[in-house]
Amino acid sequence: MIENWHRGFVLHRREYSETSLLVDFFTEEHGRITLLAKGARRPRSPLKAVLQPFTPLLLRWSGKGDLKTLTKAEPASLTLPMQTLALYSGFYVNEVLARVLENQTAYPELFQHYLQCMTRLATQPEQIEPILRTFEFQMLKALGYGVNFSICAATGDPVSPSMTYQFKENEGFIASLLRNNASFLGKDLLAFEQLDFSDKATLQAAKRFTRMALKPYLGSQPLKSRELFQSILPNKLKSG
């Protein structure tokens, strides 16, 4: 039985019965954990307003089985104020984490990166793309995705900024004359290593890489948050 307070965020919530919710949390000490929030759908439930995304929470739960029961949830601080594009970006991060994190496996460093990511999305909405790419690379590292961006996987030679490299899943980057969707310039790979996305071309290459790298983790089912983001983006650009 667990009775201590734990820091966490809501990743996803879904109906469990007429009155309750199943809630996926990302917690500092236990990683992703699904808890039964009894009565959380009732109009007067104190949990109803608390169990919202982007709100730093203090949580307590109990139970011995796989599905434990949430016994207490309190805001640790104010909900992070997300503007439109930042809001959908936050939903994207939450949806990806809900899919890729192992159940009840601690990712303490990634939890800190998540907190930094959410804070930056709320305070630097003009930097959404670099913020997302940075977190995706940090997430891949936490998942054990061991790609070396500074060494050619075939020869062991240092990556040359002027050469082109082909990405091979489960191997790494190999020097190649081929030019296709899996090709990357050495200068971009070296920037990936430093999480430096200040160059626009590097930023675009980083997005291309993370989509390929995350695909095995995410599976074939489309991300709902990505579809929502793509649907609101044209209207946002027109009004902006």
Swiss-Prot record:
Claim: DNA damage is one of the keywords in the record:
yes
What Pfam family is a match for this entry?
RecO_N
Q: What does the entry give for GO biological process?
A: DNA recombination; double-strand break repair
Q: Does the keyword Signal apply?
A: no
Q: Which GO terms describe its cellular component?
A: bacterial nucleoid
Record keywords, A-Z? DNA damage, DNA recombination, DNA repair
| Superkingdom, taxonomy of origin | Bacteria
What HAMAP family does its record include? RecO (MF_00201)
Q: Indicate the family of this protein.
A: Belongs to the RecO family.
Q: So what does this one do?
A: Involved in DNA repair and RecF pathway recombination.
Name of the molecule in the record: DNA repair protein RecO
Ranked from the top, the taxonomy reads:
Bacteria, Pseudomonadati, Pseudomonadota, Gammaproteobacteria, Pasteurellales
